[in-house]
Amino acid sequence: MEFSRREFVVGGLATGGFALAVQPIQAQSAITTDSNGLVASEINIPTTDGSIPGYYARPAGDRIYPVVLVIQEIFGVHQHIQDVCRRFAKLGHLAIAPELYYRQGDVSNFKDYREIIGKVVSKVPDTQVMRDLDAAAAWAGLKHGDTTKMGVTGFCWGGRITWLYTAHNPLIRAGVAWYGQLEGEPNELKPQNPIDLVDQLNGPVLGLYAGKDRGISLESVNRMNSALKSNGSVSEIRVYDQSQHGFHADYRPSYDPEAATDGWQRLQQWFRQHGAA
């Protein structure tokens, strides 16, 4: 899916404490992972109120593969998120990325990031997201996925959801949150934030954060780290001092190859260590 949202990039969300930075695409750095040896396609995921679209990838064959839920940035399940799914499949996972604000609107219809946030993202309730991720996990379990070895990872908007879903689903063995919001003013749609749930995590979460993030302060990261330690959690937070928000997004100028590679290696080790691989 080639979406018009790839014509611009966002350094962070304007809502919930995220600073916004619009920059041009940096296509020359974008990583492309082929689908050789994989089963990979767009899908429809049955939900309690119908269905939502998504994308999945897994190794070809009839084995059962550890499931990883891949949670989108604000731009939805665009080519970068699909590529991340294929990267996981090359490692032996069944990776699935549901479109988590499909009901609120198609973000590819908007050219301006303010419209994406104001008309779509800000209207997505956390309860809906949790149900849809449950549905994605159930779908994966019927399609060669091993949900007893299930991990979750997400980026930016999806980083916050990674913390929440790890607290929501007792089947999650481990999570990796890439620069997700940790604190914020609660409201009807978002009644809790990750820092409120440190004592409810069903599996350990590895947080990967940026020292030069203009939307997530180091003070916020430090408060989260302190809360985790106070609760005796084995979750960890790693800060890349010289990186910006979006350092894993290889199609943006914010991409930091060294930090992204290190984070990806740490993710794999984290999943292996905690039973999600």
Regions found by a protein language model. Give the residues of each.
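N-terminal cap/lid segment of alpha/beta-hydrolase-fold proteins
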Residues: S29-A60
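Short beta-strand element of the alpha/beta-hydrolase
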Residues: Y65-E73
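N-terminal secretory signal peptides and thylakoid transit peptides that target proteins
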Residues: M1-G16
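Gly/Ser-rich "nucleophile elbow"/oxyanion-hole loop immediately N-terminal to the catalytic nucleophile
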Residues: K111-G151, A276
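Short amphipathic alpha-helix adjacent to the substrate-entry channel of hydrolases
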Residues: Q79-P98, Y102-R103
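C-terminal catalytic histidine-bearing segment of alpha/beta-hydrolase fold enzymes
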Residues: V234-A277
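The feature captures the conserved acid-bearing segment of alpha/beta-hydrolase catalytic domains
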Residues: E185-N231, E236
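Primarily recognizes the serine-hydrolase "nucleophile elbow" in alpha/beta-hydrolase
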Residues: A138-P194
